Structures are given as structure tokens and as C-alpha cells.
Amino acid sequence: MGGVVLAVGLVGCLLVLLPWKRLLPDGAEQRTIEHLPTLGMVLSWLPFFLLVQRFVVDDTTVAAVNASGGASMPLLYRVAATWSARSGPLLLWAGFTASLAWWWRAPMQGESPEVASRRVGLLGGFAALLMLLAVHLRPFAPTLPGTLRGELNPLLQTDLMVVHPPLVFCAYAYCLSIAATGISSIGQPDQGLLDRITIQARPAFVVTTLAIGLGGLWAYLILDWGGYWAWDPVETGSFLPWLALAVLAHARTVPRKVPGVVLRGAALLTGGLALFATLVTRAGGAWAASVHTFVVASEGSAPNDAFGRIVALAVDGSAGVEVMAYLLVLLVLAGWWLVDLSLAAGREAHPRWLVVDLAVPLIVAAAVLVEWSTTFTTVQPGVLGRVVPFGSAWVGLVLFPSLVMTGWPRADVRGKNGFARPFGVPVDWLIAGAIANLGGDVLLAVVWLCLFSPIAVSSAPTSNIPAAALGVTLALVSAWTELVPLYVAGLMLVPFLAPWLMMDDDASPEVDIHATLKRAPLWAGAGIAALMLVLTFTILLGSIDQIHFAAHEVYGSVLLASTSGALLLYSLRRESTTVRLTMLIGLLLVSAVGALLTPGLWGGDALEGLSNVVLRGHIAWLVVPTALVAVPHVFSEVLHSARRRSTTPWWRRVPVQAHVVHAGLLLLIVGHVMTTTLVDRGDPAHRITMLKDEPVEVDGWTYTFRDVRLIPGEDLTVGDGAVHVVIDVSDGSEWRGTAEPGMTRFDASGFPRSEVDVVRGATGDVVLIFDFTQAGDLMQTVAMEGEDAVDAVRVTVYRLPQSHAVWVGWGLMLLGMTGLSLSSRGKEKHLPAA
């Protein structure tokens, strides 16, 4: 039955993506045609709901259910077990993607029926690809005889895991819908493109923010991190599409018209980063995990770059096909961007729609052939370290059609070669190949090529300042994080600086301070988000074996401070240039003096180092003062915009909601510094040993171990038994509350779950985490001698002042983003469906 339902789901995706009005004869029944996409959308969900039903009834004849299900779990947890199976999220993602293709199936503003049908076809086609990948993973495969019963990962047996993963894949479906909009508009007029993207980006921003926030809340309450954010590769990967959406959301504020090619590039980037985030999550072991995942023989060695490890996964029959499919689509998106740049620079395709209609099958066919021919070579014992040369050739062949498919220059630009295309020679491609082979990271080389191409194909390269800024950031961060050798970083850097190094001195423009202060806040939204994106992505590429927490915090702090400064400048736009400059310079002086004289003022682990010269307190002084000063000014902007007379209700006014989002962001920045930057979670000083009824004082707070509670499995919602310790918490002489951190035992998996408890107060939270390495001895002592026999316990304690700012800020951002999405309702100008 499962195979039949999967086939039905695939047919449903096809019903959504096909342009029925063009395929069926003119005399076909109109009502029938209109219902076919709706029928397809419904059918696309059937495989997912059947898998959910199998988990709900605990059908152990299905291998996935036998591995992760459980009749004793609450109903919602059995539903959540669906996305613990590898195929479950794919079916969920396919359903969301097909639903969005169906929802926006009519031509949008400025979109012709032909372009709309291509957009819907691209999105529906990706849903079909996901369905095919799910078929390959066999979600309804029968349980083999003798297979032992498994158990859902204890960390997933929580309420938040019921809603967090579906929201993540819904967000990624939105990102792919935006990418399909960008692809379908290549070679077409730019009229209405920004409106079409914005209509989709605003709800995508809401869903992505909600998904990431709930993931952070899950980490805060369930994981033993003692915080909501740790720059873990999976959460960092999901942060990248959010940053791309931030770039799109601020496209309207840029103080000049954004070219269509840039909008399409940002749209493609959004979809590509959703795929990359999925790669980080599902390319098991590639990021910050055991490298043994990729070793297939004793004499083999794992590749030391992300791309090499992903390609090495091709040997895995289940994960390999899925991961390679995502990688291929990622490269195809990069190819479309390169083609669009060539078209914008004056080259032309023959025929025009060759770019969209034939690019994908040609590129995928070539890539599959090369992947088939090189996979066997790259995974042979002893040669895993030589993946990069094969990978470079593979990627080169995948992207090669992008270089040649656009034909010849148009007559009006013939003879005007691009900056890095002397006599038509693609020097930029040659440099990218050198970066891949010398630096050893093919993904980094592809990103470099995508950033440099706007300069390479342009006959006026100095007009591409944003691309140059992003490229310089990419090169510098690659050097700082030792992702590539220094000489390779130099090879990456010089081409971005070359146009300005070659420029005449008298061609340098004069700087107008007044105009700069006026325009800078308008550029900041998109610009800072883009710089943060490049920074985060580059550090993540280097985090395959360890998390570079310090790099994220130190380098990102400059951009966080710039964000606060830009919002403050915008709030002071009615003031004179002197007032604004005085405010900024004064804040910089306060930060500098404070960092030099009193870096430990902020408390916590402010005096702990993030590098040889940078303390955590230095970061706090750089970021927090400007953010604190900006908060009241931005809230005043909210009130000012809401009180302004208008026929539009205040809750549907874009300025009001945008200022609410910005106010929430500032609070979130302050909360992040206080609860993440200033807390050294690797410091053993946070682990304290408490003797029974003897208070232990740490940083002015007192913790007293009172009792031990042993909880049998029948009294638990999930788990086979638990041990909790009762601890009184007080601030000096004032009692703050009682915490009961502990550990829950899961016998089937043998995997204990740490139970975090939080004591909340007006000034912030105190997080207490039970050290479960003592759990076995403690349980045995209680069982044999009674609870009174336990006279000491170990607990990790993190005090997080101003932690409420994180959640209040997140809530305000969601509130404002929802208002922005509602302000777009009714503005979609649809034409009859294609």
C-alpha cells in the first residue's frame, strides 16, 4: 500500500506543476482544469499522512515505526516521531512545497501567464524531486525478521519537537518558492519582480523566525547547553536563510533602485541556503561530528573540507543520493545566477528560454554522468583525501553550460569585454579553479565565483561596490579562520580590490558626511545582513570538526554594533549632522574607554578570553551601549508612526511594524550578549558540588541541596525512570525559588536525557543542569539505602541576567513581521491561472 500511495503523491506533484491550460485542448471543461492543481496538492500530502498514521497506530511491521515509534508515547510524540525517520521530513517538505506552488499558481503582479507557469513548474518539480527521494528511502519498507524494537531519540520526545521541524521545512519551502520566482523571471522584464518577491518573503520571514526561535527555546529547556544559542552547525545553517530573507526584506529601503539581476540573485541565494542548511542537517557527520562517518577503509582518510565530505557520502546508498541531489540543485542555482549575470551584461541566449527550459536537464544529465564516473574513484581505500581534484572537475562540468549557453554578446555591447574577461577569456573561472585546487574547498571556490562574477562581466567594475565588499569579507574571514592558506586568501582578495587599485586617483569621489549619514542607515539593513551572511557561511564551512564559537562572536560583534548604530542614526534622522556625529563618536568613546578600563563590569565571564587579545567583556562594551541607547529611540519611532494620521489602521502600517521588528532585534542583541557572549560554557567553574543542607555561594547567589527524588517510569509521560535533585536558590538573603534538575532514563536506547530546570526572576534566569555522569551511582544508592543516604550532588549552574530580553525581543520581532505580512494581504494582483 505504501508504494501505491507514494506513486499517488508523485502524481499529485505532477498535477500541481503542469500548465494544464496549455496542455489541454481549448474545448476542455474549464471547471475540471481549475480543480486539477487542487487535487494534486491534496494528493501530494497523502504519503506523509499515511506515514503519520502508521506511527500513530504503532505499526511495527513498518521498519521506520519499529525503529522510532512507541505505543506508550503520547499521541503528539508519536506524530513527531514521523520526522525522526529520514524519509518523513522529505514527505513533509514535499507537501509544503506543492502547497505553496498551488497557493501561488495564478500569475502574480507583473507576471505573464508563461512566466507564472514556469515558476509553478519549477516549484512543483522540486516537490516531485523530494517525493522521488522519499521513494528511494523507502519510508514504508517492512521490518526485517529479528529486528529489535527501537525508540525515538529522547531529545525529540518533547512538546517543542512536535512543531519545530514542520516549521523549519515550511520555511525552506517558502525559500524555494522565492528562488523559483527568481529563476522564472530570468530574461524577462523586471516589472513587479520586487513586489512578487516581497509578498513571499514577508510570510517566509515570520515562519523562519518562529522556527529558529522555537529551536532555541528547545535548546534552552531541553539540551544541557544552558542557553538558547551555541553556534551549533545545524542552528547556524538555519540562520543563513533567515539572513537571506533579511536582505530581501530590506530591498525596498535601499536608497536606489535595486537591479532585477540583484533581486534574482538574492532570491536564488535564499533557496540555495535553504538547501545548504538541509545539507548541514542531513549530511550525517559532515559538520562538527565524527569524521569516521566517511572512512571506508583502515588506510583511508577523511577529506578535511565540507565539499569533500559531502561528495564522499555518495558511497552511502540511502543518504548519498539525497545529499548529492541537494548539492546538484545548489550548483544549478549557482549556474542560473551566472547565466543571469551574463544576460544582464549584454550577452543573449538563443532562444531566450533556453536558459530556463533546457539548462536543468542538460546540467543534471552531465552532473549525473560525472558523479557516476568519479564516485567509484573517490571512495576507494586510501584516496579519500584526493576528493578535491575530482570534485573540482565535477563541479566544473556541472557549471560549464552556464558559461557557454548564453551565446554571443549583443550588437550594442560587442567589443566591450568584462573586467575579468579580456578577449573573452574567462579569467574569473580560471581563478576559481585555482582557489578550489590550492585551497582545497570547492564550495568556497563556487561562492567566490558567484560573488566575483558581477565584477568580472561588468565593463564598469567599480560600480559593484556591494559585491566587492562581500568578496573582501569572504577572503578575510577565510584567512582569519584558517579555512584556506594565507596565499590562497590573497588570491581571493586581490581580484575584488583590483578595479579600485587600477582606478585613477582623480576618479575617487568626494565624501559628503551629511549625505553619508543619511544614506548609511538605508543601506544598513540589506548590507549588514549580507555581510553577516558571508561571515557566518564562511565560518560554518570551517566548522566541520569543531565549532568556532569565538570567531562567530568576535567578528559578528562588529556587525551587531553596526546594526544598533544604523538604527540609532535612522531614529535621529531629524536631528542635525552635528548631533548625530556627536552621538556616534560619544558612544564609540564610551565603548573604548569601558573596554580598556573595566572589561569585567558586565559580570558573568566577562574577563574570560575569546582570543589572545579579545575578552568577552570587550565584546559587551562594543555592542551593548549602542544597543541600549538605540532601544528607546526606536520605540519612540513606533509611537510616532502609530500616531501619524492615516486611513490605514496602525497595525497594518509598514513603518509601524518595521520599527517593532527593529526594537525587538535590539532587545535580542542585548539578550544575546548577556546570555551567550558573556557565558563561558566550557568553564568548569560553573560546575559546583553541593553537600546536603550546606549552602554554596557563587557570585553572590546561594544554592542549597535539599533532597533527592526518585521517580518511577509509571509516573512519567516518557522515559523509564528519573532522578531529580531539589535545590533552593536565593540571591543573598532573598529566596528566589526551588529548582529540580535531574535525569530521565530511557532503557531501550540506553540514552539518558538531562532534565534542565530554570529559576526565573525579574532580572533574568538561573539555569541548573544535572550532571548525569553521577546518575547511575546516585540511583543505586537511593534504591539500596534510601534517599537520605545521598549527601552530595554535582550541578552545572549558569546565571543569565537579562535573559528575558531574548524572548521579549523574539516576540516583538514575530509580532512586527506578522503585521508586515498582513499589510501585504490584498495587494497581490493576480491574473487568471495559467
Regions found by a protein language model. Give the residues of each.
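A conserved hydrophobic secondary-structure block that centers on an alpha-helix together
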Residues: P89-L90, F96-T143, T147-G216
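Transmembrane-helix bundle segments that line or gate the permeation/cavity pathway
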Residues: S44-A67, A71, A80-A101, V135-A141, ...
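Extracytosolic and intramembrane catalytic regions of membrane-associated proteins
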Residues: E697-Q802, L812
